Amino acid sequence: MQPPGGDAPAGCPFSGARAAQPAQAPHEAPHVPGEADAQAGWHNAQLDFSKSMSYGDYLSLNSILDAQHPLSPDHNEMLFIIQHQTSELWMKLALFELRGALDAVRTDALPPAFKMLARVSRILEQLVQAWNVLSTMTPSEYSAMRPYLGQSSGFQSYQYRQLEFLLGNKNAQMLQPHAHRPDILEQVRATLEAPSFYDEVVRLLARRGFPIAAERLERDWTQPTRHDETVEAAWLEVYRHPQQHWELYEMAEELVDLEDAFRQWRFRHVTTVERIIGFKQGTGGTSGAPYLRKMLDVVLFPELWHVRTTL
């Protein structure tokens, strides 16, 4: 969406808009491309990038588009690779936005945090839709390339693991798949040991005057989020009097939106796996679909869901 009065530049590759064309007078002959266009540039567009940055330069497209290296002769492996690479790019943005929102919450700058959280929810919706593309792969097609995957698995995604940790689903055992990469292990461990986004929101509740239990405000951050009665009591007050606590009310709903989108992503993951490989063991050694179904029961922000029953 463009800001009011700020039309996208003609032909901008990011806007998807086509350059506006002046209407031809009835007596004018149709334009025929020729030498004059080659000299002036097509509709005044810059065509020579020998001394300036191009679209491909800015986006490092050579590196991105040369990063697909299928190991099998099977045609469908390219789909499998690009599906996961693009998912990793979206997760990179989700982590970037979540960390920005976390910093904003720490300084009580909630409106910017709302914007970032809404963006994370939209990113998760994009990831949900991506499963529709991968699900065009049939069991026969996947079986042809699966032997070439070895033990590699999405279970080992260090960005996904950081996303889980940042949202409060902590598990120190999940550090082990990254032990062979000390640089990555350090990143994942730092996220495990730091307060989650929801932990910072609970601290926000305390700063706004709600009586949150001291043991909830300072705890072992490597442990997953557990239901706390004092936190639910705070959210109950927020939901009963939203006009008095509007920012906290909006924060609560942004978090519910986010977890709702995350649950949908998990569900589509399960159904896509069941559709393609059934109930075979995953390449990373997990039970596959049964493991993923168990993950559907994980609740990231328990008080925000339970308070709906209490209201």
Swiss-Prot record:
Annotated metabolic or biological route of this protein: Amino-acid degradation; L-tryptophan degradation via kynurenine pathway; L-kynurenine from L-tryptophan: step 1/2
Cofactor note: Binds 1 heme group per subunit.
A GO biological process held by the record: L-tryptophan catabolic process to acetyl-CoA
Keywords, alphabetical: Dioxygenase, Heme, Iron, Metal-binding, Oxidoreductase, Tryptophan catabolism
Keyword field contains Cytoplasm: no
Region Disordered, residue ranges: 1-36
Any one GO MF annotation of this record: heme binding
Coiled coil start-end: none
InterPro entries in the cross-refs: Trp/Indoleamine_2_3_dOase-like, Trp_2-3-dOase_bac, Trp_2_3_dOase
Pfam families membership: Trp_dioxygenase
Alphabetical list of Gene3D superfamilies matching this protein: 1.20.58.480
Cofactor(s) required for function per UniProt: heme
UniProt feature, compositional bias: Low complexity: 17-33
Family, per entry: Belongs to the tryptophan 2,3-dioxygenase family.
UniProt-recorded name of the protein: Tryptophan 2,3-dioxygenase
Organism encoding this protein: Burkholderia cenocepacia (strain HI2424)
